[in-house]
Amino acid sequence: MFNHDWKYSINSKTFADLNIELFRNHKFKTVLNYIIGVVGWNGLKLALFVSDIYTCIKLLAFNSWSNNIIKPYLPFKISKWLFSGCILASIVLLIWEAIAGMRIYKTGNISLTYVNNFSRNLNSVLNYSKFCVYNMIERKGFRQKMTFFTFFQLKDCIRLIFTDTPRQVINGLTLWSVLVTVNKNEDLGDLESFTGLINKIKNIGQTNHEEAVILSLMLFSFIIWALFVFKFLLAVICSIFVYYKIINDQEYSGLREYICVTVSENVDELVERQRKKENDDTIYKTGLLESQTFDDFKEVENKIETSFNDTSYASNNDSMIELIERRPEYKSQDVCGPIPTMKKTETMESFVDNGNPQYTTRFSAILDSPYINSYESNDIKKAKIQSRSVNTPKYEDLSSSDIFNKIHSAGQLKSTTSMEFHGPLDSMPNTTNNIRNFNSNSSRPRPPPLQTKSSINSKADSNDNGRIYTPMKAYFREPDLPRKGLLEDEDRTYNYT
C-alpha cells in the first residue's frame, strides 16, 4: 500500500497547456463544493492549527490547561505530554507536507497537483479557475469513485491515527464524564438518560456560559474526528475489494499507480476536449464564415455564367438585325401582377434594355428613354429623342473592299448617339434570309438613313470617319474593357450637354 519503489508514468500536461478561463463556471454545485470543501474546510484546519499551538504553549510553558473550568478525565501529567506530543507531531507533519507540496506546486503539473492534497488545496484557494479544472477531472463509474475515495482516505491516515486520535480520545473521555455520566468523574457506565442530558446542558449554560462554550467546541471537534474515523474505516473495508480487483486485472502494481494513470488519462481527455472546443470556436468565427463566403461567390459566378449562356449572344460577325431577333423577351412581374410591356421605338440603346434591368448595359442607362413607373399603359409617356441619321453600313457590307473604299472616300460615316429603326420588328420579314441573299446579290438595299444631332462637334466627325463601326464591341459585359470607337464621343457629348 505504501510502496513507492515502482515506476509509474505521470502526465506532463500543465496548467500552461490549458486556457483555464474556459473551465471557469459558477454552477451551484461547483460553488457549493468550493465554499464547503475548500474555503470552509481549510479555514477550519487553520483555526484548529492555531488552537493546537495555543494549547501546546499553555501546557509546556505555563504547565496548565487552556481553561481551568473543565478538567480532563486523565491525570494532568499524562494528559499534558500526550496532548503536547500529538500537537508537535501534527506540526512536523504539516511542515513536511508543505515542503513537498510546494515542490509539486511549482511544477504546475495537473496530475501531480491533483494527487497531492497540499498543492491541490493551495491551487484551489489561490485560483478558482484551477479548482474548476480539478472539479472537471471526472471519476467515471463506481469503481473509479471507490478507488479514488480509498486512496485519499488511506493517504491521510497517518495524521488521523497518530496526531488526532490520541487527543480526541482524551476529549471524548472528558465529555463522557461531564455530560453523559450521572456523577462527574465517577463510573462511566452509569449513563445519563436523554432527558437528563438535555437538562444538564441547560443547567451548565445558565450557570456558566464559558463552560458551555468550551464543551460545545470540544463536542464539535469530537464529532468531526468521529466522521473522519468512520470514513477511514469505510476506506479500509473498500481497500479489500479495490486491491483484489487491481491484482486480478494484473495491469497495475499498486493503488497509487492506478490512481496516477487514471488521473493522467482523465487529464488527456480534458485537454483534448478543451482543444476541440477552441477549434470549434475558431471554425465558427473564421473558417466556417470564410467557407460560406466562398460558396456564395461560387454560386454567384454560376448564376452569372448561366444567365450569360442563356442570353445566347452571337459572335462579332453577326449583324445588328440578327442580334435584335435573338434578343430575349422579358416581362416584368410584380406583387400586383404582370406589368404591360412598353412599346418603344426600337433604337440601338432601347433594344438592349427594353425595360429589363437584367440586360441593362452601362450606356443604356444614359441614352435610353426614361421609364415611367406606372401600371397603366395609357398614362405612359415616352420622352422625345432626337434621332440622327448615320449612313453606316453593316459589318457584312464591308466584305467587299471596293465598297469600303467608296464609303471611306465619300466620308459617309457619321458619329451618332442613337440609331432608330423606323419600322417595327414585326414588319421585318425573315431578316436572316435577306442577309444570306445579300451575299449572293450585289444589289442589296442600304439601311435607312439615320439623322445625327447637330451638337456633335466637327472633331468627333472627322475622327469617326476613319473608323468602321462595329456594334458588338459596345455590348460586351466586361466593365474593364476600354471604350473605344464611337462610344468615346458619345460619352463626351453626353457629359458636355
Curated annotation (Swiss-Prot):
Q: State the compartments where it is located.
A: Vacuole membrane; Cell membrane
Alphabetically list the UniProt keywords: Cell membrane, Ion transport, Membrane, Phosphoprotein, Transmembrane, Transmembrane helix, Transport, Vacuole
Region: Disordered, residue numbers: 420-469
Cytoplasmic face residues: 51-80, 238-497
Query: Organism, per UniProt?
Result: Saccharomyces cerevisiae (strain ATCC 204508 / S288c)
Entry's transmembrane regions: 30-50, 81-101, 217-237
Looking at the keywords, is Nucleotidyltransferase present? Answer: no
Q: Which residues carry this modification: Phosphoserine?
A: 291, 319
List the effects observed when the gene is inactivated: Leads to high-affinity Ca(2+) influx system (HACS) deficiency. Causes a large increase of cell death in response to mating pheromone, when PRM6/KCH2 is also deleted.
Q: What is its main location?
A: membrane
Name of protein: Low affinity K(+) transporter 1
- Catalytic function, reaction form: K(+)(in) = K(+)(out)
This protein's source sits in the domain of life called Eukaryota
List other remarks.
Answer: Present with 538 molecules/cell in log phase SD medium.
Q: What triggers production of this protein?
A: Expression is strongly induced during the response to alpha-factor.
Similarity comment text for this entry: Belongs to the KCH1 low affinity K(+) transporter family.
**PANTHER family found in the cross-reference section:** LOW AFFINITY K(+) TRANSPORTER 1-RELATED, PHEROMONE-REGULATED MEMBRANE PROTEIN 6
Give the GO biological process terms: potassium ion transmembrane transport
Q: How does it sit in the membrane?
A: Multi-pass membrane protein
Q: Name one GO molecular function term.
A: potassium ion transmembrane transporter activity
